[in-house]
Amino acid sequence: MTLKEKCAILEDRVKRLQEIGLALSTEDDINVIFELIMGEAKNITNADGRTLYMISDDAKTMKFEIMATESMNFAQGGTTGIEIKIPPMQLFDEEGNPNHSSIVTYSANTGKTVNIKDAYKEKGFDFTGAKTFDKNTGYRTQSVLSVPLKNHENDIVGVMQLINAKDPQSGKTISFSADMQYQIDSLASQGAVALTNKRLVAE
């Protein structure tokens, strides 16, 4: 790739981030904001699976707001009108300690992005739920990216989880690259600010 081509790609990314930032800042419907965030995450990574969680006002749980898996033609929450009936995730255990067992609760509690190449080879987090889902459906969870939505005050308002990035040419599952992660971190920050502003207006 030539320097000119690299510059063109960079300019396109900056323009796209500006466009999505404007869209997020002017939208009033919170469900549409959810969809804008996750739709752009899909554009950046070509991820097959996407889940968006929002942290409760008491900061003890995370509610599922969007769940989607392209290859299974599955979508709930957001603007679909289909309620997600999965219980919220607990951010603390019974003793009051931060729950770091799953990558999304870890991201919520620490503010750190987690990028995993293969969930089945990962020893640091509990992927029992994903493996059970895979066993029941024939799916194969592989690459996983968990990103906290951190606003301008450094408060974490939610977490975005992306599953199975896809190569746009071959369609094969690939890892989330460092470049993808950087762009998603930027998107998550924009989304967090928009959601925080929406909550402030609602109050």
Which stretches of residues belong to each language-model region?
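Flexible loop/coil segments at beta-strand boundaries within sensory signal-transduction domains
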Residues: 58-59, 150-156, 165-168, 182, ...
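Signal-transmission/dimerization alpha-helices at domain junctions
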Residues: 109-113, 159, 182-203
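A short, aliphatic-rich beta-strand micro-motif
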Residues: 142-151, 158
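Short, hydrophobic-rich beta-strand element in sensory/regulatory alpha-beta domains
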Residues: 39-42, 48-56, 60-64, 104-106, ...
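GAF sensory/regulatory domain recognition
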Residues: 51-98, 121-122, 160
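Signal-transmission linkers at sensory-effector interfaces
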Residues: 1-36, 43-44, 197-203
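Signal-transducing coupling segments at domain and membrane junctions
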Residues: 100-105, 112, 117-143, 165-175
